[in-house]
C-alpha cells in the first residue's frame, strides 16, 4: 500500500491511496468466501462452488462491495498513519471497482483540524443590558411566593368575585325546553376562566353560596353544536359553594413555613442574594453571546461541511430528547410544524457553524496563551459529574473512557472564554430588571 498527500485545502486533506494487486486479490478472495455461503449454484453444495463459476453466473461485480469493505478501511487507516493525518470527521471516498490482478487506486477527502488565524479578539467592546437587581424585583418575588403559598378559604357570607371557584348546579333551557348537554351538577367553575359561553360567568359575580339565578345568554353563531348556534338560552344556576384564595401575610411565620429562615428579613436577604446570582449568570451569558459573535467576525476559520454536519446531528439528537420529554417524537414535531428533517437541519446550520468555529477559535486561543488543565482540575470536574449522577468516581472514569480527553478540552475552552470575558470592554447600555431577565 502506498499513500500520497496531494494537498490540504479548506481544512480537508486530499490523499491518493494505492493498494497492490496482491491485496486486491486478498480482498476478492475474502469476498468470495463470504458470498459463496449465501448463494446456491446447481451441481454444488452450498459454499462449495468455485469462484470462477460464481463470477460467471452472477458477474464479477458480485464480489466488489464485500471486497471494498475489506480493502478500503485497512488501507485508509494505514494511509492516515503513514501521512500523520488526524481526521476530525468521516472522510468522503472516490472509489472505482477493483480488478483482479491489477493495483487498486482510490481517493479520500479527509476533514482535518483547521488552521485558525486569530484576529484582534482581546479587548472587544460589547454592549449588554443592565442586569442590576432592584428593590421591585425583590418585591415581585415576594408577591409570587405569597400567591404560590396562598390559602384556599371558603366564602360563607361574602359574594362571589372574579377569580373565585364556584361549585354549581345548572340546567339550560331554550324556549322553555331543556336541551341535551345543558345540565350539570357539582360543577367546578372558576369565574374569569371563560369556560362557559360569553356572558355566563360575569352574571354569577355577586351571588352568595345558597343563592340561585337565571342566567340569560346567547350561543355564538360559531358554536360547535349547530342546533344551538345563535340561539338565546336561560340557565337556572344554583351556587352551592364559593372558594377564594388569600395571599399570605409576609411575616416571620411565613418565612419559617416556606424556608429554612426564622425571620422575614433573613428570607428577604436570601431572595436578593439568589436574584443577584441569577442576574450575574445572565450577565455573563449575555457578554459571552455578543463577544463570541464579534470575535468570530475577526477570525479566519475554514471548517469543512462534514464537521458542521456532525454538529447539526448532535443538535438534532438533543432536540429529539427535549421533544421526548414532552411526549413527542421528532416525526410528530415535523408533522405539527409542516417541516422535515432536511428543513430543520438547514435552519440550525448557521448556529451549528458558529458553535464549531467558536470551539476551534477558543482552542487556538488556549494554545497560544499556554492554557492547560491540571489533573487536579480535571479530577475535580469528574468528581462533580460523579456526584450529579450518583456514581463512584472510578466507575464514571471507566464509563467515560477516552471521552475524558474531550472533558479536558472542554475545560480548556472554558478557560479561554473566561479569558476573553475578562479582557472585554463591557458597556451596560440599557436597564433590565432581574425579574424581567428571568
UniProtKB/Swiss-Prot annotation:
GO terms for biological process: 'de novo' cotranslational protein folding; cell division; chaperone-mediated protein folding; protein transport; protein unfolding. Residues 163-248 form the PPIase FKBP-type domain. The keyword Nucleotide-binding does not apply. It is an enzyme of class 5 (isomerase). Pfam families: FKBP_C, Trigger_C, Trigger_N. Its EC number is 5.2.1.8. GO terms for cellular component: cytoplasm. It is found in: Cytoplasm. One of its GO terms (molecular function) is ribosome binding. Keywords: Cell cycle, Cell division, Chaperone, Cytoplasm, Isomerase, Rotamase. The keyword Metal-binding does not apply. It catalyses: [protein]-peptidylproline (omega=180) = [protein]-peptidylproline (omega=0). Its main location: cytoplasm. InterPro entries: PPIase_dom_sf, PPIase_FKBP_dom, Trig_fac, Trigger_fac_C, Trigger_fac_C_sf, Trigger_fac_ribosome-bd_bac, Trigger_fac_ribosome-bd_sf, Trigger_fact/SurA_dom_sf. Involved in protein export. Acts as a chaperone by maintaining the newly synthesized protein in an open conformation. Functions as a peptidyl-prolyl cis-trans isomerase. Belongs to the FKBP-type PPIase family. Tig subfamily. Consists of 3 domains; the N-terminus binds the ribosome, the middle domain has PPIase activity, while the C-terminus has intrinsic chaperone activity on its own. This is Trigger factor. It comes from Syntrophomonas wolfei subsp. wolfei (strain DSM 2245B / Goettingen). The gene is tig.
Amino acid at each position: 500500500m502506498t499513500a500520497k498527500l496531494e494537498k490540504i485545502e479548506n481544512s480537508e486533506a486530499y490523499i491518493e491511496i494505492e493498494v497492490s494487486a496482491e491485496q486486491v486479490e486478498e480482498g476478492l478472495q475474502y469476498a468470495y468466501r463470504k458470498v459463496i455461503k449465501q448463494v446456491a449454484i446447481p451441481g454444488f453444495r452450498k459454499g462449495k462452488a468455485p469462484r470462477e463459476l460464481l463470477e460467471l453466473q452472477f458477474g464479477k461485480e458480485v464480489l466488489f462491495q464485500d471486497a471494498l469493505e475489506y480493502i478500503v478501511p485497512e488501507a485508509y487507516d494505514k494511509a492516515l498513519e503513514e501521512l500523520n493525518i488526524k481526521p476530525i470527521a468521516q472522510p468522503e471516498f472516490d472509489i472505482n471497482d477493483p480488478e483482479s490482478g491489477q493495483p487498486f487506486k482510490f481517493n479520500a477527502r479527509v476533514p482535518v483540524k483547521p488552521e485558525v488565524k486569530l484576529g484582534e479578539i482581546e479587548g472587544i467592546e460589547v454592549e449588554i443590558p443592565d442586569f442590576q437587581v432592584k428593590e421591585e424585583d425583590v418585591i415581585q418575588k415576594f408577591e409570587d411566593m405569597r400567591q404560590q403559598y396562598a390559602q384556599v378559604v371558603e366564602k360563607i357570607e361574602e359574594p362571589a368575585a372574579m377569580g373565585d371557584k364556584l361549585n354549581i348546579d345548572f340546567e339550560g333551557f331554550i324556549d322553555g325546553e331543556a336541551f341535551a348537554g345543558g345540565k350539570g351538577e357539582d360543577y367546578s367553575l372558576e369565574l374569569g376562566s371563560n369556560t362557559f359561553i360569553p356572558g355566563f360567568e360575569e352574571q354569577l359575580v355577586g351571588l352568595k353560596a345558597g343563592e340561585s339565578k337565571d342566567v340569560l345568554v346567547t350561543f355564538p353563531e360559531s358554536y360547535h353544536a349547530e342546533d344551538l348556534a345563535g340561539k338565546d338560552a336561560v340557565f337556572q344556576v344554583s351556587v352551592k359553594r364559593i372558594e377564594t384564595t388569600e395571599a399570605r401575610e409576609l411575616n416571620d411565620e411565613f418565612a419559617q413555613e416556606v424556608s429554612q429562615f426564622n425571620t422575614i428579613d433573613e428570607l428577604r436577604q436570601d431572595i436578593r442574594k439568589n436574584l443577584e446570582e441569577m442576574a450575574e449568570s445572565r450577565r455573563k451569558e449575555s457578554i459571552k453571546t455578543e463577544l463570541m459573535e464579534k470575535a468570530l467576525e475577526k477570525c479566519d476559520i475554514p471548517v469543512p461541511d462534514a464537521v458542521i454536519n456532525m454538529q447539526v446531528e448532535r443538535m438534532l439528537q438533543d432536540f429529539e430528547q427535549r421533544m421526548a420529554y414532552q411526549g413527542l417524537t421528532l416525526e410528530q414535531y415535523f408533522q405539527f410544524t409542516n417541516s422535515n428533517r432536511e428543513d430543520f437541519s438547514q435552519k440550525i446550520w448557521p448556529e451549528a457553524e458558529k458553535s464549531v468555529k467558536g470551539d476551534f477559535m477558543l482552542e487556538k486561543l488556549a494554545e497560544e496563551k499556554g492554557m492547560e488543565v491540571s489533573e487536579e482540575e480535571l479530577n475535580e470536574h469528574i468528581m462533580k459529574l460523579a456526584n450529579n449522577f450518583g456514581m463512584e468516581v472510578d466507575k464514571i472514569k471507566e464509563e467515560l473512557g477516552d471521552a475524558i480527553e474531550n472533558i479536558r478540552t472542554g475545560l480548556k475552552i472554558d478557560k479561554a472564554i473566561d479569558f476573553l470575558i475578562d479582557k472585554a470592554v463591557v458597556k451596560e447600555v440599557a436597564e433590565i430588571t432581574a425579574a424581567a431577565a428571568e
